[in-house]
Amino acid sequence: MAQFLSKPFGMTPNGEKINEYIISNPGGLAVSVLNYGCIIKNIWVPTKSGPVDVVLGHDTYADYVKDFESSGSTCCGAFVGRYANRIENAVFNVGGKTYQLEANNGKNHLHGTFPRKLYEVKTFGDTLLLEAESPDGEDGFPGNLKISVRYILTEDNALRMDYRVSSDADTIINLTNHTYFNLDGGGDVLGQKLRIYASRYLEGNNETCPTGNILPLSLIHISE
């Protein structure tokens, strides 16, 4: 059975409380999550020499706000949406209608406002549940959304992320978590290797907007 701890992390200009929630299991895995952006602030994994934090995070709420509101935001640790990645020219079509979005990355739309939302938090079993809503027209997207994010610690010391969204209108959605990992807990990552089991990839243009072309993967593409 997981254990839960909460503590203050900051306050918005409107007086809303930012809290840090730490969920840990008997196997020694612990995860720190904020109700601001569903941010994963820390992941401590058990090692022979003690717990090691294997993700990057900021020390204060103000640091996260400064990051997320900058033109070069890293979205460090955040739950990203309504649409992760870039939408070219900040425009798309769905249900026979054209929607113009906020152009927040040059002429394109990038990620959306989910990283800057406040979420209601519930805990049960091995699960931290965060819930919020996104009104119709937010960032230009159609549909009122109900959002739930679950962070679950499993018995084999894994962190599972479960996203669920419902909409009352035709819309598009593409969700991800924007955590940065350093498996050594510090220093650079140049000696670390990542293996991706894939045979194809989604092509991007010179502004890294998806072209819609799904191409075969090769070692040349990986090195690029």
Question: Locations of the language-model features?
Answer:
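Extended, loop-rich substrate-binding clefts of extracytoplasmic carbohydrate-active enzymes
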Residues: 2-17, 22-26, 97-98, 102-156
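Short, well-ordered strand-loop elements centered on a beta-strand within folded domains, enriched
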Residues: 3-5, 30-32, 37-45, 51-53, ...
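A conserved active-site cap/scaffold subdomain adjacent to cofactor or substrate pockets
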Residues: 187-219
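Conserved small/polar residues in nucleotide/adenosyl-binding loops
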Residues: 220-224
